[in-house]
UniProtKB/Swiss-Prot annotation:
Enzyme Commission number, as recorded: 2.1.3.15
Pathway connected to this protein: Lipid metabolism; malonyl-CoA biosynthesis; malonyl-CoA from acetyl-CoA: step 1/1
Keyword Ribonucleoprotein among UniProt keywords: no
Pfam families to which the protein is assigned, alphabetical: Carboxyl_trans (PF01039), Zn_ribbon_ACC (PF17848)
Physiological role: Component of the acetyl coenzyme A carboxylase (ACC) complex. Biotin carboxylase (BC) catalyzes the carboxylation of biotin on its carrier protein (BCCP) and then the CO(2) group is transferred by the transcarboxylase to acetyl-CoA to form malonyl-CoA.
GO BP term (any one): malonyl-CoA biosynthetic process
Zinc finger residue ranges, C4-type: 33-55
The protein's name: Acetyl-coenzyme A carboxylase carboxyl transferase subunit beta
Annotated residues for binding of Zn(2+): 33, 36, 52, 55
Any single GO CC term annotated in Swiss-Prot or TrEMBL for this entry: acetyl-CoA carboxylase complex
Keywords, alphabetical: ATP-binding, Cytoplasm, Fatty acid biosynthesis, Fatty acid metabolism, Lipid biosynthesis, Lipid metabolism, Metal-binding, Nucleotide-binding, Transferase, Zinc, Zinc-finger
Enzyme class: transferase
Annotated gene: accD
Length: 293
């Protein structure tokens, strides 16, 4: 190896060592795309809604970032922010459930895995629930179920459309049957919302699985999804072992579900607000100032 090659290798090692693999972690200047391995300047990635400029991969984002994309500036009013999970079963596997809660709360600044509230989208009202995968994999426990149910009930009372941004590994096993019952509770609240002919849209992001998919994620009047999002109930390996068949490579992706009629539209993150605006207008949602006159 020549001296020039040696210096070039050293520079490459130093450069790569400062690259983060995850947009949610670290404060490095550079981020490597988990899909195509392209290295991007962090500020450029953030300005593009955390979507890779090279391959279009939609990196995972947190609830605050989601709200900023969807809601008009300073329009989001959060509800039920003080609700916090307990440990009704005294559950312990490798670690105590209570310790897992504390760790997730400290790491995310959230009390549980969903943020709910009312906002406006280009001056039109929208009830909004945003699940945050950082909090115990977006799992649905009793607090997540209660907060989503409450925002649906508020939307029903005030005749607002609702959008639920789904990002979840499913029901939270540490709460047992209390977690599973949230599926029925949320579905019941959505039924009353539907009876008033109000619009409900789930946005399926990566990943949307388990009990969330088996309940409110698939009950929308219009089901939206982000590109290449993993959407399903059981895992691919479980299904293949059960059926003893090899599944298609794109199985359980947003594109596969769109092709087979389970998803209505795939929306790129940069187009989400414009798409929501068009849908709300088509469904006759009035701007707040107009609705109050």
């Amino acid at each position: 190896m020549s001296l020039i090659d040696w210096f070039a290798a050293r520079r490459k090692d130093q450069f790569v060592g400062k690259v983060s693999q995850d947009t949610d972690e670290g404060d490095g200047l550079w981020v490597k795309c988990s899909e195509c391995s392209q290295v991007a300047y962090r500020k450029d990635l953030i300005s593009n809604f955390n979507v890779c400029n090279n391959c279009g991969h939609h990196n995972r984002i947190n609830s605050d970032e989601r709200i900023n994309i969807i809601a008009d500036k300073n329009s989001f009013k959060e509800f039920d922010s003080l609700l916090s999970p307990t440990d009704p079963l005294g559950f312990k596997d490798r670690r105590a459930y209570a310790d897992r809660i504390k760790e997730s709360q400290a790491g995310t600044g959230l009390r549980d895995g969903v943020v709910t509230g009312i906002c406006s989208v280009n001056s039109m009202p929208l009830a909004l629930a945003v699940m945050d995968f950082r909090f115990m994999g977006g799992s649905m426990g009793s607090v997540v179920g209660e907060k989503i149910t409450r925002i649906i009930e508020r939307a029903t009372l005030e005749n607002f459309p609702i959008l639920i941004v789904c990002a979840s590994g499913g029901a939270r096993m540490q709460e047992g049957m209390l977690s599973l019952m949230q599926m029925a509770k949320i579905s019941g609240a959505l039924k009353k919302h539907k009876e008033k002919n109000l619009l409900y849209m789930p946005l399926l992001t990566h990943p949307t699985t388990g009990g969330v998919t088996a309940s409110f994620a698939m009950l929308g009047d219009l089901i939206l999804a982000e590109p290449k999002a993993l959407i399903g109930f059981a895992g691919r390996r479980v299904i293949e072992q059960t059926l003893r068949e090899k599944l298609p490579d794109n199985f359980q992706t947003a594109e596969y579900l769109l092709e087979h009629g389970f998803v209505d539209v795939i929306v790129k993150r940069k187009d989400l607000k414009d798409t929501l605006t068009k849908i709300l207008k088509i469904h006759g949602v009035k701007e707040l100032a107009e609705a109050n006159t």
